Amino acid sequence: MRGGLNDVPNLHLLGVTHPDAVVFPQHDLEIYGRALCGYDDMVPLHASRRRTTRWQIAMAHGHYVPPDDWAAESHRSWRISDAALSACQADYVALGHWDRAAQVGDGAVPAYYSGSPHLAGTVNVIRLNRRSGVMVAREPLTASAAR
């Protein structure tokens, strides 16, 4: 499989080593998403998956567009709307495509772009807690972690 990636321990790539989801039973966590492999489907974030775990994180690669800008941004590919974020019903949505870190959406579901950790020197740290819910913090990379 793709250069032996299936043989690398603890490496999980949606669309490569797993079709669309990875379950981590020890954390009662499922991470799901779809690899964008072509231009025949321009919808990066589909409706919710049936839950099999306490925690669910959705991943999507695309461009978030707020409701007021939706018509003006029709030229963009892989658009993500507030409705799509809400419909996924995940506990957290990890987004990729933007170089800068940002929280997006109407807040119904926590949705964040991590930006470029290498350029910013930071990452999003997500904590899932049964009592306090989802907490997101920007944390600096240490010099050794950034290499």
Locate each region found by the language model.
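His/Asp/Glu-rich metal-coordinating catalytic cores
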Residues: 1-112, 116-121, 127
